Amino acid sequence: MTAVTAAQRSVPAPFLSKTYQLVDDHSTDDVVSWNEEGTAFVVWKTAEFAKDLLPQYFKHNNFSSFIRQLNTYGFRKTVPDKWEFANDYFRRGGEDLLTDIRRRKSVIASTAGKCVVVGSPSESNSGGGDDHGSSSTSSPGSSKNPGSVENMVADLSGENEKLKRENNNLSSELAAAKKQRDELVTFLTGHLKVRPEQIDKMIKGGKFKPVESDEESECEGCDGGGGAEEGVGEGLKLFGVWLKGERKKRDRDEKNYVVSGSRMTEIKNVDFHAPLWKSSKVCN
């Protein structure tokens, strides 16, 4: 049993070995690298780190899970406003020191108020399951530790990407709407002879006089014959505006009615003022 324990201690946990290789790779120093002293490593670009580097070494791309896994091996955040992590046995050029890093024992409180140790010492040194998400290897209370901040950062990054996609969609829809508007203006000015100022009023919701064709304008001075009135339709209405003027029959009818009414009044007046001696009736 002692020989097995010694053999396990001579080999670092897979998570530690992969993390060391990830940090020590100079081709990705713009994303993650050692600090100037070589006593800690810094993640400079969290989004690229999670998207591009984590899947190459681990079975996930969750930055928060990676942080929680560091916590289980005793790493600590050294700078509040920077993703810089350190461990006494994790330093540049000291890969042989990784065997001295021990994994913490997960302790949870039972319903009876007693503490129960999860996992044996041999399991803590073997590093089994390091490649999986740390939600299965860390304690339930770890979300209340600095890992909760990493969760928030990951959520905000995802929300930011979602907003960018929505912004691009809205920009495309706006460009399509502007194109349709330009096509409509071209149609109105080219085919229906609508003046630009009328289009402006139409867009702004204003009111203006209907647009009449040349034939209808000429018929305005014609006599109110029935043939001219029969050929008039209701016209075309667009956005609540008549583009083709409707013949106003009612005005002519009212005009004719006034003329007829005056004639009837004259006749009645003549009858009323007729002399009594011209009456055909004779009183006996």
Swiss-Prot record:
Q: Where in the cell is it found?
A: Nucleus
GO BP terms in the entry: negative regulation of DNA-templated transcription; response to heat
Please list where the region (Disordered) is annotated.
118-151
Motif Nuclear localization signal covers 247-252
Q: Where is this region: Hydrophobic repeat HR-A/B?
A: 147-192
What keywords would UniProt list here? DNA-binding, Nucleus, Phosphoprotein, Stress response, Transcription, Transcription regulation
Post-translational modification note: Exhibits temperature-dependent phosphorylation.
GO CC, alphabetical: nucleus
Residue range(s) of DNA binding per entry: 12-106
Nucleus is among the record's keywords: yes
Q: Where is the signal peptide?
A: none
Q: Name one GO molecular function term.
A: sequence-specific DNA binding
> Per its record, what triggers expression of this gene product?
By heat stress.
Q: Where is the composition biased (Low complexity)?
A: 134-148
Domain remark in the UniProt entry: The hydrophobic-rich region (HR-A/B) corresponds to the oligomerization domain.
Outline what the protein does: Transcriptional regulator that specifically binds DNA sequence 5'-AGAAnnTTCT-3' known as heat shock promoter elements (HSE).
Assigned protein family = Belongs to the HSF family. Class B subfamily.
Query: Subunit composition?
Result: Homotrimer.
The entry's protein name is: Heat stress transcription factor B-1
The source organism is Arabidopsis thaliana (Mouse-ear cress)
User: What is the name of the gene encoding this protein?
Assistant: HSFB1
